[in-house]
Amino acid sequence: MSTVSIKGLEGEAPTKNEVLLNWIAENVELFQPDRVVFADGSQEEWDRLTTQLVESGTLIRLNEEKRPNSFLARSNPADVARVESRTFICTPTPEGAGPTNHWADPAEMKAELTERFRGSMKGRTMYVVPFCMGPINDPAPKLGVQLTDSEYVVLSMRIMTRMGAEALAKIGDTGSFVPCLHSVGAPLEPGQEDVAWPCNEEKYITHFPETKEIWSYGSGYGGNAILAKKCYALRIASVMAKEEGWMAEHMLILKLTSPEKKVYYIAAAFPSACGKTNLAMLQPTIDGWSAEVVGDDIAWLRFGEDGRLYAINPENGFFGVAPGTNYSSNPNAMRTMEPGNTLFTNVALTDDGDIWWEDLENMPEHLTDWLGNDWTPESSQPSSHPNSRYCVPLAQCPVAAEEYNDPQGVPISAILFGGRRPDTVPLVSQAHNWDHATMIGALLSSGQTAAAEGTVGALRHDPMAMLPFIGYNAADYLQHWIDMGKKGGDKMPEVFLVNWFRRGDDGRFLWPGFGDNSRVLKWIVDRIEGRVEADETIAGYTARVEDLDLTGLDTPIEDIREALSAPAAQWKSDLADNEEYLTFLGSKGSAVPAEVLEQFEALKARVAAAES
């Protein structure tokens, strides 16, 4: 029996962990909630909370025949996405956070947020949400506990993590956990009516790498509030990984099976809007090949006993961008939602209680848009917010690989980097070695499109697709990649650079993409197995058109040949920008690894040789 008293808790706490109970009790005094509830992750809890939120107007219950046990939330229009400008890495010195993060002094930030948190849960319930990152049966699990005043967050965490009583049992009486504090920052005075989506104009998403803590205030949305996702799984985990000799990466994990039934596991890091979820749920268009998903967003990679790199998916669900997802671009994502049990946010509502978003089939004549207004096809604004989301259990995916529940993880054969480049970067190239791969990842970028703000064609750098998520100095992060390569030696995965987005002079895409990307994956497997040669280009070992399986593809061979080219003039025009970016990455307390700089000098030499 614990001696710790928690104000507002009905009955006895379901744990004897004194550290956990004392932490909860201290924060109850700070936040001053009306009630304290331990989230158990049960169906009864889901039903109770969803019913409560439907009654309060936060959720809309969808058509039970079309979307069983599914709900739509509409957020405050000022709370619709991750707020990178209000995301802080709080290390003792600015050099610890490095050039790519917003830094704040840990003591000052804690003092400021403590005052923000004081009384911020008045009139609300504090939920204690224990969760496990990755399979619950992991013998050495990474655990966390989030305190939150948002029922929406509790529901989202139930989908996205292994949450509740099982995770609390894993923490046990003496186990450690990452403490996560979250408040929407909207206290209620007695008699004050609540709003459908409580939040605060002031937002803080703060990380304390030294003490492995996460404090978030003011937002109820997505990665700002579901703290297991980017905050823990990438920002804090990347620090843990550096300290403990593993990797936390913004990567999908794909299981690929050949016609001979040989299995390959591929991890891939793409910046946003570059097709990560679509590749994770790939439907191959070449006979005899099948693909399954282990994860669509985050990979934790550790060395196995055999010296190879093994990956787990620390998540348990998909938190996908809705617009653009349909039965053509990603049929498996659509099928994952068909059984229901899905939380939709900021999409449109049909008149018969279903959902709709841009690029979905069968546009209705009338909708209620994400702001609650009437919408017709003639409306000038999109019906759904561009960052609207579906949150759905991974287990419902028809191509979910059973290995996603294996705590040993899966051995990675290849790592892919890819951006959205209309020119320059070939369809697929292999890195010369791990050091070359690290440079490729460090300089990963996407070209601006006409749809984006900024100069068309200008590069947006996103090293390893981790720019918003590296929890420490980016130069030290690159050094960690180099160090992992040294440790793994010749057992490290082969690394490839892909680009599905090459365009011709007239602006058309040169490669069909989507399911046909399986043809590129087949070439990658052929390279791993030593079955095909490659052309030595500026980019690396680039595929030859005759080695790609183009059976049944009606794309002109000239287009594919152009997609595989690495024009020297285009590579040369990137060099100054890339050199400047490497200088930037090394500009705050830590140097970019010598190996990366040597690889960049070798790249410059290849460009010069190709020009002569």
UniProtKB/Swiss-Prot annotation:
Molecular-function annotations in GO: GTP binding; manganese ion binding; phosphoenolpyruvate carboxykinase (GTP) activity
Subcellular location(s) of the protein: Cytoplasm
Q: In which pathway does it act?
A: Carbohydrate biosynthesis; gluconeogenesis
What is catalyzed by this enzyme?
A: oxaloacetate + GTP = phosphoenolpyruvate + GDP + CO2
Please verify whether the record's keywords include DNA repair: no
Q: Per the annotation, how and in what number is the cofactor bound?
A: Binds 1 Mn(2+) ion per subunit.
List the InterPro entries hit by this protein, alphabetically: PEP_carboxykin_GTP_CS, PEP_carboxykinase_C, PEP_carboxykinase_GTP, PEP_carboxykinase_GTP_C, PEP_carboxykinase_GTP_N, PEP_carboxykinase_N
The answer to whether the entry has keyword Lyase is yes
Provide the binding site for GTP.
Answer: 273-278, 389, 420, 514-517
Please name the Gene3D superfamilies in this protein's record: 3.90.228.20, Phosphoenolpyruvate Carboxykinase, domain 1 (3.40.449.10), Phosphoenolpyruvate Carboxykinase, domain 2 (2.170.8.10)
Chain coiled-coil ranges: none
Show the active-site residues: 274
Q: Where is the signal peptide?
A: none
Query: So what EC number does this one have?
Result: 4.1.1.32
Q: Which residues bind substrate?
A: 82, 221-223, 272, 387-389
NCBIfam families, sorted: PRK04210.1
Q: Which family does it belong to?
A: Belongs to the phosphoenolpyruvate carboxykinase [GTP] family.
According to its UniProt entry, what is the function of this protein? Catalyzes the conversion of oxaloacetate (OAA) to phosphoenolpyruvate (PEP), the rate-limiting step in the metabolic pathway that produces glucose from lactate and other precursors derived from the citric acid cycle.
The name under which this protein is listed is Phosphoenolpyruvate carboxykinase [GTP]
